[in-house]
């Protein structure tokens, strides 16, 4: 009866009957609900999930697609490709190695690769970032160029303005800026209790006899800082293992005295009165 009384289309354009409701722009959908019992007919899921979006959410989706790129339209073939693929192996290494620092693109020898044309179009994704291997500072096989002193420039001028002799320049340039430690035998003398002792595994600067850690007397426990350690060698044959024809008796309980041959000759305290023990710092 309503269709007969009220015409479906207005007589005058732009004018509608005040009592007739405006037809909705989209067909309202019922909320998805679970049937209370088996076999009950329930509403089916729509074939197109985009039909469930209202006008506001649909406008938000179009705005997001427009931000990703102008070539992204509203077609279905683009909706499946919208996403960022994350490689956990690459991204985790970058996060752990760099931390909060930002990536800087170097002009020469850069390890940062830009995205190829057509690859991840519109997403602004770059290719995986590659970093050089970190050089261990405490390794003997590390690159010495990281620890060397400033060298000459292209113009032939030095970075330092002071002038030195050629012999001093060679000595300074050949000297490593980083010093390694090695273990040596140490021979010490305490002036407080007038006791001499010998210690093994003393940390010294590599290539020198300079002691790196403070030593403690085994008798009075007084700590002193010896700057140098005597080299363990025979004073007559200048060898670590004495090759002299006349050798004194070697005590098997104290084998370190065998390397101190000739050390107590002419000294107030003989090697028999020294105390030998080992300790590791």
Swiss-Prot record:
Pfam families documented for this protein: Zn_ribbon_3CxxC
Listed GO MF terms: mRNA binding; zinc ion binding
UniProt subcellular location: Cytoplasm, Cytoplasmic ribonucleoprotein granule
Keywords: Cytoplasm, Developmental protein, Differentiation, Metal-binding, Oogenesis, RNA-binding, Zinc, Zinc-finger
Domain of life: Eukaryota
Zinc finger (3CxxC-type) stretch: 183-267
Any single GO CC term annotated in Swiss-Prot or TrEMBL for this entry: cytoplasmic ribonucleoprotein granule
Primary residence: cytoplasm
Protein's GO biological process: negative regulation of translation; oogenesis; translation
Presence of keyword Ligase: no
Leader sequence residues: none
TM spans (from-to): none
Tissue and organ distribution: Expressed in oocytes.
UniProt free text on domains: Disordered regions undergo liquid-liquid phase separation (LLPS) for the formation of membraneless compartments that store maternal mRNAs in oocytes.
Record note on quaternary structure: Component of a cytoplasmic ribonucleoprotein complex together with eif4enif1/4E-T and cpeb1.
Cited function: mRNA-binding protein required for maternal mRNA storage, translation and degradation during oocyte maturation. Controls timing of meiosis during oogenesis. Probably promotes formation of some phase-separated membraneless compartment that stores maternal mRNAs in oocytes: acts by undergoing liquid-liquid phase separation upon binding to maternal mRNAs. Binds to the 3'-UTR of maternal mRNAs, inhibiting their translation.
Similarity section: Belongs to the ZAR1 family.
Name of the protein described by the UniProt record: Protein ZAR1-like 1.L
